[in-house]
Design a protein with these regions (language model features):
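A generic structural signal for well-ordered alpha-helical segments
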Residues: 74-75, 136, 159, 192
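Non-catalytic C-terminal accessory region of glycerolipid acyltransferases
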Residues: 2-13, 20, 152-269
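Catalytic core of membrane glycerolipid acyltransferases/transacylases, capturing the structured
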Residues: 42-65, 77, 92-147
């Protein structure tokens, strides 16, 4: 019995070390991939056309396939599994505001890998990070500087004819471990009212919980974590607000309703 227990402990330890190593390898590969896209692929895309719109579309395609490849690599390494409910609603989404909760570090990677083309909001840290600034700037992603200009940039992007949908996480940061949802920042609601485009809710759950806010990447679970993505039907702003004119009151009301909606939907899981 003691030998069996010892063998089980050794196996458990080896499994943990494998997961830590595989996770570290995955994120190192992600960083190297960012440098490669910024230093090699992006310049080639720039040479392929003088049209800024085409450059952005092609860079977004490169990022989409890179993120899809990264997700599949993590699956092959046994780190994670995932499944999608309602993929067809997201895959070819156009001129929608796609909003999702944010439980893990890899949410944006998984979602962009699923969308044929996507515009995205990025933080200053990603905008200036040497590993990521090349790809995100070349792709025409929008810098979230917390200013009026940021809102205007998002609205302009969404109102462009046949524009790719805009992906945004209203929580603004990953959900704290043990919490269902952070408070929503008002940017998404503000953009939705001003652009007057459909809102596409996406629910993300991760079991067991990992890669949350303030959690070290090497604090890996004892088993593969599973990400479930559920894409819901689009919501029209007019269905949520009696008066959809732009005003601080309407922004607050829409923000509250969206947060309440996500809370209710996530509580069902």
């Amino acid at each position: 019995m003691a030998k069996m227990l010892k063998a089980a402990q050794i196996k458990q330890k080896a499994n943990y070390l494998w997961r830590v190593g595989a996770t570290g390898f995955s994120f190192a590969s992600f960083g190297i991939g960012g440098v490669a896209i910024g230093g090699l692929v992006a310049p080639l895309v720039n040479l392929s056309t003088r049209n800024p719109s085409l450059r952005q579309q092609r860079t977004q395609k490169v990022i989409k396939h890179s993120f899809k490849g990264f997700t599949e690599m993590m699956v092959k390494l046994g780190i994670m599994t995932y499944d999608i409910e309602g993929l067809e609603k997201l895959q070819h989404s156009k001129q929608e505001l796609v909003i999702a909760n944010h439980p893990t570090l890899v949410d944006v990677v998984v979602l962009i890998g699923l969308m044929e083309q996507a515009n995205c909001v990025v933080k200053q840290a990603l905008w200036s990070n040497p590993f990521t600034k090349g790809p995100v700037q070349n792709a025409g992603y929008i810098l979230n500087a917390g200013s009026e200009q940021f809102i205007q940039d998002c609205v302009k992007k969404l109102k462009t004819d046949q524009a790719a949908s805009l992906l945004i996480f209203p929580e603004g940061t990953r959900t704290a471990k043990g919490e269902l949802l952070n408070e929503f920042q008002r940017g998404a609601a503000n953009i939705a009212i001003r652009a007057h485009v459909p809102i596409r809710p996406v629910l993300i759950t991760c079991t067991p919980s990992t890669l949350t806010k303030n959690e070290k990447w090497y604090h890996v679970p004892s088993q593969s974590f599973h990400i479930h993505v559920k894409v819901l039907d689009a919501i029209q702003v007019d269905d949520l607000l009696e008066d959809a004119t732009v005003s601080p009151k309407n922004v607050r009301q829409l923000n509250h309703q969206l947060h309440q909606f996500f809370n209710q939907e996530l509580s069902k899981k």
